Design a protein with these regions (language model features):
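Short Gly/Thr/Asp-enriched flexible loops that form oxyanion-binding sites at enzyme active sites
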Residues: 144-155
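Short beta-alpha junction loops
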Residues: 76-78, 140, 165-167
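Gly/Ser/Thr-rich loops at beta-strand to alpha-helix junctions
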Residues: 43-50, 137-145
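Long, charge-dense
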Residues: 70-117
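Structural motif
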Residues: 40, 133-135
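Short, flexible loop segments at boundaries between secondary-structure elements
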Residues: 156-167
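N-terminal, charge-rich interaction modules
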Residues: 8-90
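A short, acidic, amphipathic alpha-helical segment used as a generic capping/interface helix at domain edges
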Residues: 116-128
């Protein structure tokens, strides 16, 4: 299912993505068994806003028009919600002023566990959405303290996942 496009916002990119992601075999429908459950939608970092708009339109309009329930799960939102709920957001912002980049990354890696924080939140959000396919976004915003390869290796869901990332 590999195809490269010059621009993620191109109409042909959108139609290709919708066509592929609404396929019954990919979704495990009508007696088909999914061959794989994780897909990657890379885009150039300079096209971030186009990728965000594309995923929003595909999830809100294109896939539902084909009978596919899609959900977006934003890793950055999960991280911010967790830090805020634990009362860690303000102290982290204060520490950012004095810490080096590497120290800040270490603080975040020690605080935001993929296994105990991110994974359960992603699985919960996918389950609550009762979706046929889930788009994981916010990957660039959480790199390098959230490693998506670790997350994908640990997620336990039958829902196909599309990892949307700058790269």
């Amino acid at each position: 299912m590999t195809r490269k496009f010059e621009h993620i916002g191109a109409p042909e990119a959108r139609s290709f993505i919708v066509e592929r992601l609404s396929d019954d075999a990919l979704l495990g429908r009508k007696g088909f068994t999914m061959r794989q459950s994780t897909y990657v939608l890379p885009y150039p970092p300079s096209q971030r806003s186009y990728a965000r708009d594309l995923v929003a339109a595909v999830c809100a309009d294109d896939l539902p028009n084909r009978g596919v329930r899609a959900a977006q799960v934003n890793l950055y939102d999960i991280v911010l919600d967790y830090l805020d709920s634990q009362g860690m957001w303000e102290p982290l912002c204060e520490a950012e002023q004095a810490a080096t980049r590497d120290e800040l990354i270490m603080m975040l890696q020690d605080t935001i566990s993929v296994t105990s924080v991110i994974k359960p939140a992603v699985e919960r959000l996918i389950g609550e959405a009762e979706c046929d396919i889930a788009f994981i976004t916010g990957v660039g915003e959480t790199f390098p303290y959230v490693r998506t390869h670790t997350l994908l290796g640990e997620i336990d869901t039958d829902t196909p996942i599309v990892l949307v990332f700058p790269g």
